[in-house]
Amino acid sequence: MKKKPFYKVLYVQVIFAIIVGVILGHFYPSIATDMKPLGDGFIKLIKMVIGPIIFCTVVTGIAGMEDMKKVGRVGGKALLYFEIVSTFALLLGLAATHLLRPGVGFNIDPATLDGKAVASYAAKAHGQSTVDFLMHIIPNTMVDAFAQGEILQILLIALLFGSVLAHLGERGKVVTDFIDGLTRVLFGIVHIVTKLAPIGAFGAMAFTIGKYGVGSLVPLLKLIGTFYLTSVVFVLVVLGAIARFTGFSIIRFVSYIKEELLIVLGTSSSEAALPQLMEKLEKAGCSRSVVGLVVPTGYSFNLDGTNIYMTMAVLFIAQATNIELTWMQQLTLLAVAMLTSKGASGVTGAGFITLAATLAVVPTIPLSGMVLILGIDRFMSECRALTNIVGNGVATVVVSAWEKELDRNKLRQALKGGGEVAPTETTAGV
């Protein structure tokens, strides 16, 4: 097959668009800020199909399972993995901030901070208890879940729908076949929308640089650098070790999903690449049922980048305001962050709202301290989203391996960038 010219390759187009967006934002900020609708429009186009794709993928995956106990088993293994890896991410963020101390030297008086700028984030985060979170998973109506784009609500509906179809067997085959066909149509729509990724990335990046300016980064470069460095270490060391133990290279895996990562980089939203990621994981040998359960769940329960950010941001504010936290308070912070991070989604700004929820229950640190990082949060959200999507991709491969439903032949071919996939060779374990 003839190789595409480099300028027609999607990730090359996205890189070029991001560079042009940065240049426009720096030299013509007034024009660049008007480009925001391009980024917002692209994300809306992707979000338009996320709910239906998750529903169809999960339903067909579960309907094809002969053993319904498998649904609970896969879900249980996924949640166990999420909790273990999330704990590593929280601890790494804590350790890196203690080691590199990015907030030391600011000497900010908490009394001088104006909390009005972060009041809206605090209001959104206030009062979100565990019971509220669990009750929110149950939609008011099926239509409302899709209309609002609530991933966990759609996942609940899909689990029930798929379970009933599996129970019906041949009697439900017509419905199952219809949903399977609808899945193909939806992914076809995604392929069309993805071609617009360079335009979306250009608009989002131009707006970000145009509004905040490169100069706004300088005073807080140490925090940004610490966060990016810690996230890279997490991906290469923690996720790298998990990947190696499972039998694949984290570097090759990251290279395999580079187009999705560049879309995330341009839009700062890991949801923007969710449909493409699910399709890529299936092509890499993960079973549809595992992909359908693990990826959507991971977008609420496996946000590694957000976890690193949470502990790092809280400790940074404490260091900047010269507030000493005891080890008991830091352990409390870990426990609280473990819960509040589960309410975050893959949308820009969700990490900042989650931070407000964490600070609200750690009264030692003033909530108004969030203004210190409000201006740079947009620049950190890219790294959060990138780490989140890599973490969810690795989690899906690992759970597929645990379930003995990972086609290692397909995985090897995909990560090598090979063409034809050899006959199925299902894994015999991790």
UniProtKB/Swiss-Prot annotation:
Gene Ontology CC terms, in alphabetical order: plasma membrane
Keyword Cell membrane part of the UniProt annotation: yes
GO BP term (any one): L-aspartate transmembrane transport
Keyword Thylakoid recorded: no
Membrane topology type: Multi-pass membrane protein
Family the entry assigns: Belongs to the dicarboxylate/amino acid:cation symporter (DAACS) (TC 2.A.23) family.
Name of the protein described by the UniProt record: C4-dicarboxylate transport protein
Species of origin: Burkholderia cenocepacia (strain HI2424)
